[in-house]
Design a protein with these regions (language model features):
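Generic preference for well-ordered secondary structure
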Residues: 1, 17, 38-43, 77, ...
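Serine/threonine-rich low-complexity intrinsically disordered regions
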Residues: 9-10, 66, 115, 122
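A conserved beta-strand-loop-helix scaffold within acyl/acetyltransferase catalytic domains
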Residues: 19-60
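Acyl-donor binding region in acyl/amide transferases
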Residues: 52-117
């Protein structure tokens, strides 16, 4: 069963970032994904005056996972971070992980590429109206 949980301590966050080969961001909040008790992925995110920022969304590198576990872990964890950002009253979010592939996953999570190349989503009513996702309604 897939679980997405906040990482409770900075040492745990740092260790999971090392397992995912991503930089540890001491000032970022973080979630971890697990499937059947096995940690699969980590997400680091933050908020500032500009909006929410998903800095990293990555699988741990020390174990192989099925495509299903990989896709579900990344998609649901990305959406969980977006929902937390939205619940904090921050209604703009940016996907900042420039090394993340494939772009299709970023789009399926809900982000759209702006003219400047940044990935953006307007979270206003995003979780109220799920049918709007992916239809060009998320503009900066």
């Amino acid at each position: 069963m897939l679980e997405i949980l906040p990482i409770q301590t900075k040492p745990e966050q740092e260790a999971l970032c090392a397992r995912a080969s991503i930089p540890y961001r001491v000032d970022a909040m973080a979630y971890r994904a697990s499937v059947d008790g096995e940690i699969t992925a980590v997400c680091q995110f933050s908020m500032d005056a500009e909006g929410g920022h998903i800095h990293d969304l990555a699988m741990v590198k020390d174990k192989e996972f099925s495509d299903r576990d990989r896709i579900e872990s990344l998609f649901v964890m990305g959406r969980a971070a977006m929902n937390f950002i939205d619940l904090c009253g921050v209604h703009k979010a940016y996907f900042e992980d420039t090394a993340f592939e494939p772009e299709g996953m970023i789009k399926s999570i809900g982000f759209e590429k702006l003219e400047d190349g940044r990935w953006f989503v307007d979270l206003t009513d995003f979780f109220v109206e799920p049918c709007q996702h992916g239809h060009g309604l998320n503009k900066a």
